[in-house]
A protein has these predicted regions:
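Transmembrane alpha-helical segments that form core, pore/gating elements
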Residues: 24, 82-84, 88, 120-179, ...
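Transmembrane alpha-helices of multi-pass small-molecule transport proteins
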Residues: 4-54, 81, 139-146, 161-180, ...
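Hydrophobic transmembrane alpha-helices of multi-pass small-molecule transport proteins
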Residues: 24, 45, 85, 94-116, ...
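C-terminal-most transmembrane helix of multi-pass membrane proteins
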Residues: 17, 114-115, 191-193, 227-286
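Specific transmembrane alpha-helical segments of multi-pass solute transporters/efflux pumps
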Residues: 25-75, 111, 199-217
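Juxtamembrane C-cap of transmembrane helices in multi-pass membrane transport proteins
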Residues: 1-6, 19, 56-66, 74, ...
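Juxtamembrane helix-entry segments on the extracytoplasmic side of multipass membrane proteins
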Residues: 6-14, 36-42, 114-142, 176-196, ...
């Protein structure tokens, strides 16, 4: 709602990265201080580029060009990218269970999105907007696959404060002129509260929870929970009386939860390595 009352997408991205940087720096003062070599601080710049700058900017600009339903459908590509990149970068196997789970989740999410589209949101799609939205998903999938070792090495507050700091340094030189044009006096107080909600809950707490998962879960598992977002959106809309739950959406919910379960239960590289070592041990002692 904030984006309809004086704060557009680029402004919101700018506030999110700056607000996130400030909150994570404040939080870091209450956690154990960690020594970070210069090379890792530079790596965190890369994490900020892929996990925040490209992801947020590409999606925000893409959303302004294409339709909401198209942009939502594009987000279903992220677990597919994460699965492929995890195979190429982290050597995580693409098992049948994992592949079927990702496709089931993707199908369920698409059903939710398409059955939730209304004539009031019938903006025409745009190929460049769609490509930007896909680029945003590829960017975040790269972040999940490339920077998992970095996330596991340091505390989530250390990683996030540097990621958001770098993102602020990359984004604000290009957006400060746009932000300064906001008619601050005309923006309703409710809009500032909504922006604050996005910064604190959607960004600060959101990245804390995401990184806790990233530390312990495989990139494909982290990304597949992306399919739950449209289901949560529809459920909340039904609860507040803005939508009606449809039969096809119930089927979609089953597909999403089944897909997530299959991906979570699929074997990781460590599982397969342990199994191979166990077989080798049994053969040696047979």
């Amino acid at each position: 709602d904030a984006m309809l009352h004086g704060i557009d997408g680029i402004d919101l991205v700018s506030f999110r990265v700056l607000g996130g940087a400030l909150l994570f720096w404040i939080a870091s003062f209450f956690t154990k201080r960690e020594h970070i070599p210069t090379k890792d601080i530079i790596k965190m710049a890369g994490a900020g580029i892929f996990g925040l700058v490209c992801n947020q900017c590409c999606y925000t600009i893409g959303l302004s060009l294409t339709s909401p339903s198209n942009s939502s459908i594009m987000t279903t590509s992220m677990p597919i990218f994460a699965m492929i990149l995890s195979f190429l970068i982290l050597k995580e196997p693409i098992t049948w269970k994992k592949a079927i789970g990702v496709l089931m989740g993707c199908s369920g999410a698409c059903i939710i999105i398409l059955t939730s589209a209304t004539a009031g949101n019938a903006k025409v799609g745009n190929i460049w907007g769609d490509l930007l939205c896909i680029s945003a998903q590829l960017s975040f999938a790269l972040y999940l696959a490339l920077f998992k070792p970095l996330v596991q090495k340091y505390s989530l507050f250390t990683v996030n404060k540097w990621m958001f700091t770098w993102a602020t340094l990359f984004i604000w030189p290009f957006t400060i002129g746009h932000v300064s044009d906001i008619p601050f006096a005309q923006v309703p107080m409710s809009t500032w509260w909504e922006t604050g909600y996005v910064i604190f809950f959607g960004t600060f707490l959101g990245y804390i929870c995401m990184m806790i998962g990233q530390k312990t879960l495989r990139p494909t598992v982290v990304s597949v929970y992306n399919y739950v977002q449209p289901l949560v959106s529809v459920t909340v809309s039904v609860i507040v009386g803005l939508a009606v739950f449809k039969g096809m959406q119930a089927i979609a919910a089953i597909l999403i939860f089944s897909g997530v379960w299959l991906v979570v239960k699929s074997k990781s590289k460590n599982d397969i390595d342990k199994h191979d070592h166990s077989l080798a041990y049994e053969k040696r002692h047979a």
